[in-house]
Amino acid sequence: EGFNIELAKQKERARASRVSNQSMNNQNEEYLNFKLKSTFIGYETLDASSQVIAIFKDGKQAESAKGVIQLVLDTTPFYAEMGGQIGDQGKLTIDGMNFDVINTMKLPNGQHLHIVDMKQTNIQVGDRVLVSVNYEFRKAICQNHSATHLLNEALRKVLGGHVLQQGSQVTNENLRFDFNHYENLTTKQILEIEKMVRDVIVQDYPVCIS
């Protein structure tokens, strides 16, 4: 009974997360109608000199703004939140002053939306900025992302090919992997799955993007 209660709670959390992101994108006409092109370069570099092509404040476009705002850049190395994986964090520099990029999300038409705390400094459309992804933060997310693939494979080998991913959450601190199975895992199965994943990790195989 306790297992079923926790399973129901997890399903509700996953549903709420999907609804939250979908509602932000699908219910805001400003986001839906924004069509300017933005290029992601985050697989080649973690730093860029970029131009601000749009500013959103409280869900509405603005020519200039300060405080916690959302920026779209013509080019960006920041990976956006998607598929249960959190977005990049980092720094934005303008006129020698540094500001925190606290999250990155994706707009309905594919552009990456940077949530930046500009404090009391005003920023305008057309401004040139330097942006830099937090390498350690990105690295930790990548490691947990890779771990979800290892876990998926181990689950299928131990439990059977019927196991399918039903959802996941990947952060810089941990991961959650949701899967279908017809009964609770035994202690023996859990230990076997953990060993399979750890055995691959200690091999320290190179990970390549193709």
Regions flagged by a language model, labelled:
Residues 1-210:
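A glycine- and charged-residue-rich anion-binding loop/surface
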